[in-house]
Each structure stands twice: as C-alpha cells, then as structure tokens.
C-alpha cells in the first residue's frame, strides 16, 4: 500500500475539525439521563468501511516507519472476551456499533499488545484493555489512542496529551483496532495523525476532551461533538437530534438510555465498561505464552 492514496476523500465542512485550533473550548454541558427499556433490537444501518492511506509524520511527531503488513493477522493469537456490547444512535441514525454477529457485526477479538503493530497503520484507532482474573477488582475503562506508526501512539493520559510506546502505555496487555466502531466518515489518515500530533503536550486546563476515547475519535473524525461543550445547550434539541445508547443484554433484551450530547453518552458507556469485568473465554496462559 505504501504512501499511495487509494482514493481521494472530499470533506465537507461538517467533517472538518472545528473550534479553536488549540482544541480549547470553554462551554460545558451538564445534563440528566432518561432511561427506558425495549425488547427488540434495531437493525444497524449499513455503512462502508473506510479505505486506508499511507501517511508521513507531521512536524512534532517521532518518525513513523511503516507497520508490517496486516495481511498476516490470521497467524496471530486471538482472544475472545465476554464483554458488554453497545450501539448508539442519534435519532434514527446509527453512529456507533460494538455488537458482534450479523453481516455488519463488529470484530471484538483482541490481540496481545506486542502483536498490534502488525495489524495497524498510522491513523488507526486503538482500544487498549487490561485483563484481570475474576476475583480481582474491575479493570480500568478501555483506553483509546491514535496509532502513529513505529510502535508509537498519541493519547490523552493522566490529564496530558502525550506520545508513548504502544508496548508501555498504561501497561495494557491486549488491544484491537476499532476504526469501524464509530460510523462517521473518517478523515484521511495523514490528517488524523496531524490532528493528534498538533495537540501533543497540552495539559488538563488546556484540553477540551474528557477522556481518551473522545480525543482519539475527534482526531480521526474531526467532529466537534466529541469535545466537551461542543453541542447546543441541553433541552433545546428535537428528539431526532438526541442520542440513544443501547446496552445489549442478550436474548434480544436491550437497555436504552437517552442523552443530550455525545460527550455524556460516551461518559456513560465508559462507566458501564469500567464497572464490568472482562472475562477471557480462553486460558490466560495462552496470552502469556503468546507475549513470550
């Protein structure tokens, strides 16, 4: 694939990064959550998967050599987790899906962190996870990052946007590529990396993202909705502009929560993720052997 573009993506204004170039916005929303229940799952709308692009590292980033081909991923050891599955909608439009099964189902397999560079290209979104035995306290919420090549990631960690080695970031032991979970049209990979690098070094008081997922997703999709205070004041939106998080409970049972902003939906989704335990359906010894 190299650095040759497979296609040229024409972006409209709604897909470009907005707001202050420093990423600083002062507005902040505080809204309540309304819950209701449904027995039927809605079908997810069909969206094409984004093409990949070769990129060059922008100024300020550590040089990013090309990652090994991802075509050999079938040779890598996969783990399957028993974890909470979600989908999210704005009105009737599906904007996020972490649901397995079906032709549009997400691949929820995870890999040892040491195997991820073979699956990644610069501009990819990664979700990093900590696996713990069931008796242990719940693990932290999944951590999101932008892969910039050469085994390096840029992420929001402990109140700072920083560049770290993928192998050392937060001591996570497994991860996966999650480019397709959000259904927005992505920016070209070079711009994704540029967005991430352009905010390196920002501290808590300068950051307008409330968690690692919102920052990484903003880098890839450039939508101001991922920023704190990036949407209209609560209570002024019609139902078709409100957000709905569906927690899939199995046996066609769905728990649905309504939100006035994407920021609050992501916060609740991550709270549920952090309160659950990731239980490996295969022996943890397999993971240890794979890392060795």
Swiss-Prot record:
InterPro entries, A to Z: LRAT_dom, LRATD1_LRATD2
A GO cellular component annotation here is: cytoplasm
* Phosphoserine modified-residue sites: 38
Biological process, per Gene Ontology: cell morphogenesis; cell motility
Q: What is its main location?
A: cytoplasm
Domain of life the protein comes from: Eukaryota
Q: What are the protein's UniProt keywords?
A: Cytoplasm, Phosphoprotein
Pfam families, per database record = LRAT
As for subcellular location, the record says:
Cytoplasm
Q: Could you say what the effect of mutating residue 38 to A is?
A: Abolishes phosphorylation
Q: Membrane spanning segments where? A: none
**PROSITE patterns named in the record:** LRAT
Q: What is the tissue specificity? A: Only detected in testis. Highly expressed in colon cancer cells.
Q: Where is the LRAT domain?
A: 133-228
Q: Does the keyword Glycoprotein apply?
A: no
Briefly state the protein's biological role.
Answer: May play a role in cell morphology and motility.
Similarity comment: Belongs to the LRATD family.
By what name is this protein known? Protein LRATD1
What organism is listed for this UniProt entry? Homo sapiens
Upper lineage is:
Eukaryota, Metazoa, Chordata, Craniata, Vertebrata
Name the gene behind this protein: LRATD1
């Amino acid at each position: 694939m190299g650095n040759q573009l497979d296609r040229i993506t024409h972006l409209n204004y709604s897909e470009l990064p907005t707001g202050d170039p420093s990423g600083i916005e002062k507005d902040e929303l505080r809204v309540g959550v309304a819950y209701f229940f449904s027995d039927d799952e809605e079908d997810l709308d069909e969206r094409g998967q984004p093409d990949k692009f070769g990129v060059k590292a922008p100024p300020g980033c550590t040089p990013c050599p090309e990652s090994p081909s991802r075509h050999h991923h079938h040779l890598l050891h996969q783990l399957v987790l028993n974890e909470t599955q979600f989908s999210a909608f704005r009105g009737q439009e599906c904007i996020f899906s972490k649901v397995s099964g079906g032709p549009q189902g997400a691949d929820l397999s995870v890999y040892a962190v040491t195997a991820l560079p073979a699956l990644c290209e610069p501009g990819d979104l990664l979700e990093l996870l900590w696996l713990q035995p069931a008796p242990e306290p719940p693990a932290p919420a999944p951590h999101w990052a932008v892969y910039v090549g050469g085994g390096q990631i840029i992420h929001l960690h402990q109140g700072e946007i920083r560049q770290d080695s993928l192998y050392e970031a937060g001591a996570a032991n497994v991860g996966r590529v999650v480019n397709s979970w959000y259904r927005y049209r992505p920016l070209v990979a070079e711009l994704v990396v540029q967005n991430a690098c352009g905010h390196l070094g920002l501290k808590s008081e300068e950051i307008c993202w409330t968690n690692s997922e919102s920052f990484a997703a903003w880098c890839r999709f450039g939508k101001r909705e991922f920023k704190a205070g990036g949407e209209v004041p609560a209570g002024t939106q019609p139902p078709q502009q409100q957000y709905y998080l569906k927690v899939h409970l199995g046996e066609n049972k769905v728990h649905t929560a309504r939100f006035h902003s994407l920021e609050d939906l992501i916060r609740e989704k991550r709270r549920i993720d952090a309160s659950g335990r990731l239980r490996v359906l295969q022996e943890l010894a397999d993971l240890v052997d794979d890392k060795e």
